[in-house]
Design a protein with these regions (language model features):
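Short, charged, surface-exposed secondary-structure boundary motifs
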Residues: 42-44, 71, 134-136, 180-181
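Structural signal for conserved beta-strand scaffold positions within catalytic alpha/beta enzyme cores
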Residues: 34, 61-64, 125, 145, ...
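Short beta->alpha linker loops
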Residues: 43, 100, 127-130, 156, ...
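Class I SAM-dependent methyltransferase SAM-binding "motif I" and its flanking Rossmann-like core
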Residues: 104-165
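Solvent-exposed alpha-helices and their adjacent loops that cap or buttress functional pockets
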Residues: 1-2, 24-25, 89, 97, ...
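Short, surface-exposed amphipathic charged segments that create phosphate/polyanion-binding patches used
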Residues: 73-81, 138-141, 164-168
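Class I S-adenosyl-L-methionine
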Residues: 1-15, 20-22, 27-121
């Protein structure tokens, strides 16, 4: 019997935001796949452990994805991870890959998900609460009303090129460019204020 792979979003950090579907999949799994080399350093694992303490007894397999833009290095890492996943699935194992937020938003899980599907094997996802939705809920604001647009902008973008976007802009993975982002938004805020326009920044 062939196994299956499930990418499980564990939310932004609050263990109370872990979904019932995620908890069930984790409890029913044979093996937990982590996007970190060590479970002690994996934020997603720490979140789950607070709700599903029995995860400590599960077989854990770290998936090592190097933080690099070198295509050859990334491809080699993906090949190794897929080979490990395929071996376990051929043994009939039910695998759960933990990922922060939602597996469909900037998640390393998809490197494996696509390979598994291409090989004709079973892969699916369980949604998690994305960080930007959690922030909006915490602030009590709407991300979009009526026909407003939402733009999700990763740190790889040139910040200056996004100031003309209409609607809501969500900047993600901007740690290395945070100072630059703040400076650009301050300049834009002042410019819009002079023109009698508003720019809400959270």
């Amino acid at each position: 019997m062939e196994g299956r792979l499930i990418g499980v979003g564990v939310g932004p950090g609050d263990p109370e935001l872990l979904t019932l579907a995620a908890v069930r999949a984790i409890r029913e799994s044979d093996c937990i796949l982590l996007p970190n080399e060590k479970k002690e350093e994996c934020y997603a694992y720490k979140i789950v452990r607070q709700v599903v303490p029995e995860i400590e007894e599960k077989d854990v397999c770290p998936m090592q994805f190097p933080m690099t833009k070198d295509a050859d290095v990334l491809r080699a890492a993906q090949d190794r991870c897929f080979a490990e996943v395929r071996t376990r699935m051929m043994q009939g194992k039910k695998l759960v890959f933990l990922t922060i937020g939602d597996p469909s938003v900037y998640s390393t899980y998809h490197y494996i998900h696509r390979r598994v599907l291409a090989a004709g094997m079973s892969a699916s996802m369980i949604s998690g609460v994305p960080s930007f939705c959690a922030v909006a809920a915490r602030l009590g604001i709407s991300l979009a009303d009526q026909g407003e647009e939402i733009h999700i902008i990763p740190g790889s973008y040139t910040v200056e090129d996004t100031t003309d976007y209409t609607g809501t802009r969500i900047y993600m993975k901007s740690g290395k460019k945070l100072k630059q982002l703040i400076d650009v938004l301050r300049t834009e805020f002042a410019s819009r204020e002079q023109q009698g326009e508003t720019l809400e920044i959270y």
